[in-house]
Curated annotation (Swiss-Prot):
It comes from Methylorubrum extorquens (strain ATCC 14718 / DSM 1338 / JCM 2805 / NCIMB 9133 / AM1). GO terms for biological process: alkanesulfonate catabolic process; nitrogen utilization; uracil catabolic process. Gene3D superfamilies: Luciferase-like domain. The lineage of its organism: Bacteria, Pseudomonadati, Pseudomonadota, Alphaproteobacteria, Hyphomicrobiales. This is Pyrimidine monooxygenase RutA. The FMN-N(5)-oxide reacts spontaneously with NADH to produce FMN. Requires the flavin reductase RutF to regenerate FMN in vivo.
Length: 364
């Protein structure tokens, strides 16, 4: 099972809580996190893009770095770990993204890939005059399909002449092309999103569900498997979980309850308002899950709470779901959490024995 880290490009990571660690994003913080991930043998890091936050008492995600420039910097200071940036496709033309990706491929010596997002929060784009109107909610993946076609043509052949509804390319050129095959991630959970992923992407990212229910996401993966059956492509699912661990189950649970007690209701209200703006994409989108009030404190991602041994066992259960390639992890405290994961959780995981074995061999 592959394991990656969803690095905190926005302030406070993924906890909307006054009781959680409060911090600003910086290159130095994300460099430390990425180097720790590499040190502990993790496989990749991914940075999101967020152009406007949720406000509230914690100013949640009101402060963000930019994904491509951050990953370019990280590419220059790492040697093994794979790096994924996120492209806000309403802001950046595909030919520019293709060239930026090729550049970071060069910096990283072939360790770069791309996450594509359509955009679901109107104020992120309206503030720049780039929101195409609410009818876009229902056509996001038609737009993204043309976008991905341009990317693939440029990366694979160095040229695109695509004439579509959204993009018209005229002898568009790209050189140098990436030295390694450029992998595409998509996190769309709607039917249209699944169809796009099965057609154009290499990995599907989905939310875990519930607290200490590591296989509850299985129906999402099954839906992707159905979409893949129509395209015949090899696409695996990666699942997002928050890890809250401590020496004992009781200590970890106490932290989780403390975070929940400080939930930022104002920030969550903003999230709910923005989620309700999309009336066209159906009930199965990521934003529908994020805006559910059940576990507002961490936008309803799957959460693994317990001792190091408990979390290790729960993570080993994740990979038992057919079609699952790995997990994407976030932590309440990234630096301590990563060290605890690398030294106290990962060595207990059956699904990561190959990594611990390699690390022991390197030491020897």
């Amino acid at each position: 099972m592959n394991i990656g880290v969803f690095i905190p490009i926005g302030n406070n990571g993924w906890l909307l809580s006054e009781n959680a660690p409060q911090y600003m994003p910086s290159f130095e913080l994300n460099k430390q996190i990425t180097l720790k991930a590499e040190q502990h043998g993790l496989d990749f890091v991914l940075s999101m893009i967020k152009l406007r936050g949720f406000g509230g008492k914690t100013e949640f995600w009101d402060h963000n770095l930019e994904s491509f420039t951050l990953m370019a910097g990280l590419a220059a200071v790492t040697s093994r770990i794979k790096l994924y940036a996120t492209a806000p496709t309403l802001c950046l033309p595909p030919a520019i993204v293709a060239r930026m990706a090729s550049t970071i491929d060069s910096i990283s010596n072939g360790r770069f890939g791309l996450n594509l997002v359509t955009g679901w929060q109107r104020p992120e784009y309206a503030q720049m005059g780039l929101w195409p109107g609410d009818e876009y909610f229902g056509r996001r993946y038609e737009y993204l399909s043309e976008y991905a076609q341009v990317l693939r043509e440029l990366w694979e052949t160095g040229r695109s002449d695509l004439k579509g509804e959204f993009f018209q390319m005229e002898d568009c050129r790209l050189s140098p092309r990436p030295q390694a095959e450029m992998k595409i991630i998509c996190a769309g959970q709607s039917t249209a999103g699944m169809e796009f992923t099965a057609t154009y992407a290499d990995y599907n990212f989905c939310f875990g569900k519930g607290v200490n229910t590591p296989t509850a996401f299985a129906p999402t993966v099954e839906r992707l498997e159905e979409a893949k059956a129509k395209t015949g492509r090899d696409v695996s699912s990666y699942v997002l979980f928050m890890v809250i661990s401590d020496e004992t189950d009781e200590a970890a649970r106490a932290k989780w309850e403390h975070y929940k007690a400080g939930a930022d209701a104002e920030a969550f209200a903003w999230l709910g308002l923005q989620g309700a703006a999309d009336t066209k994409s159906g009930a199965d989108t990521n934003i529908r899950q994020m805006a559910d009030p059940t576990s507002a404190v961490n936008i309803n991602m799957g959460t693994l709470v317990g001792s190091h041994a408990t979390v290790a066992a729960l993570l080993d259960e994740v990979v038992t779901v057919p079609g699952t390639g790995g997990v994407l992890l976030v932590f309440d405290d990234f630096l301590k959490g990563l060290d605890d994961f690398g030294t106290k959780i990962q060595p207990l995981m059956r699904s990561r024995r190959h990594v611990t074995g390699e690390m022991l061999a390197e030491v020897a």
